[in-house]
Amino acid sequence: MRILSIALFCCAFVTVNAQKTKQEVAEAINSKYTTYSTIAKKIWDYAEVGYKETKSSALLQETLAQAGFKIEKGVAGIPTAFIATYGSGKPVIGILGEYDALPGISQDAVPEVKTIGGKTSGHACGHHLFGTASAAAAIEVKHWMIATKKSGTLRFYGTPAEEGGAGKVYMVREGLFKDVDVVLHWHPASLNNAETGGTLANKNGKFRFYGIASHASASPERGRSALDAVEAMNVMVNMMREHVTPETRIHYVITRGGEAPNVVPAFAEVYYYVRHPNREEVKAVWERMVKAAQGAAMGTETRMEVEVMGGVYNMLPNETLAKVMDKNLHTV
């Protein structure tokens, strides 16, 4: 976390030759290691899922406010989204911070399988480090700007619901990034490196099927199973896997499948993700899946509706900045 904070700082304003400045910043961040690690540990313990990161967001807001940042709460109509700003004028440098956890996982911070009792969510992707290290970098950039009398605007974007909620999409729609010159972003991993690869575009949504309930033993002929429709759709989508490009990723989970085996389910729901490096390919695969769902509904005499839950374009990397980041990672 310390290394990434320092590297983010170096990429924000400092020239690659300012070795003395980098060393001073490294020492400053290291001296505050206990403070920042405590913040990260608290967010780890909170383990709040997307759009519900109330305590995690508040903690980062408080940390940045105490460091002299102006806080704008609840941006884009999202209670846990915020922007922390320091300075004015150009350039406008954005630093992203995430802090949402994943549902259905509560692994303890140990190298073997060990769940945390009483918890149903956890930080499998290290977002407790993501938000904290980004905040640390922003704070140190601010201190450097004061010391060197540098002008410019520094913004920390508190971005909720990265895990499937596409929180940043709503922030982009509100124009919160319109005047930004560059955005710095990182993610915890098992090693420190700077990549020039992009990310997968994504579209996800829920397919809901409505049938007719009936007793499965006494009057099965009167029922129309919504679960049959879900299973029929899944079979067709699984057959489709042979006929999509190798980079395509399709994931699903049945979220509703009925209440009892002896009752024909009147309602069933399946949640799908589609990913691909190209947004247009995601769209094309999604349209084929919708046709499969329509066919499943027709064949089972049920009714189908689909709700798109979210979607994102593939990230466009900046090779020049990646090289700068890589050089600074080796430096620190």
Across the structure, where does each feature detected by a protein language model lie?
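Acidic/His- and Gly-rich active-site-bordering loop/insert found
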Residues: 19-123, 128, 132-153
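Metal-dependent amide/peptide-bond hydrolase catalytic core
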Residues: 231-332
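Bacterial Sec-dependent N-terminal signal peptides
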Residues: 1-21
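Divalent metal-coordination and catalytic microenvironments
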Residues: 43, 84, 95, 127, ...
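A non-catalytic, amphipathic alpha-helix used as a structural packing/dimerization or gating element
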Residues: 24, 28-31, 35-38, 55, ...
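Histidine/acidic-residue-rich, glycine-tolerant segments that coordinate divalent metal ions
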Residues: 113-122, 128-129, 145-267
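Sec/Tat-exported extracytoplasmic proteins
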Residues: 29-33, 40, 44-47, 68, ...
